[in-house]
Amino acid sequence: TPSRSAEFFFGALVHQTIEDIHRWAMDGKADKLDESEIQNLFHLNFQNLLKRGLRPIGPKQREEAFVQVMNYFKQNRSEFSRIIETEVDVSVEKDNYILIGKVDLLLGGDGKLELLDFKSQPRPAEYDDRIFSYYRQLCTYAHILETRDGRLPERLMVYWTAEPKKEDALMIFPYERNVVDEAGAHFDKVVSQIQN
């Protein structure tokens, strides 16, 4: 549908531009980033999404997406030195399936590991079902990272880029093993239902 297509385009544009900012930071070029350079990255991502045949967003949505990117950049620039990795592929092999995901950002500092996922939408109300769903996803990714690398993330975070202020945008969760176990049981059940 057109609205879902626009929603995907918007989210991908914000997400890919923030990823580019992180890559610049990882390459030691964060100090060269300014609004003009970010506008160039944003424009390139817009063009690349068009080339993929996606239906573009209108000028108002495009401006809103750029504002989200710039708000994130301005309020989180001091964190860029803590970036360990961006767009981290994670997977775990189970008996009957392989669970695959992608972590948007790994941060570190003082020997601690933090996992962050971006959502290009407003922060939902506290008891919205999506929050637990995202939390379960983050716990699963944390478990995969612990299994793969032997390092357990201490903080799991969601960053709602549509929120203008960092304190509203950043949602922090603890890692809880029982949530991982519940998520694993949920995936096992879903796979079993699909196979049968």
Feature annotation, model-predicted:
Residues 11-15, 65, 105, 141, ...:
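A residue-level signal for conserved active-site and pocket-lining positions in enzyme catalytic cores
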Residues 1-9:
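C-terminal, charged and often intrinsically disordered regions of DNA end-processing helicases
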Residues 18-26, 73, 120-123, 146-150, ...:
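Hydrophobic/aromatic-lined pockets within catalytic cores
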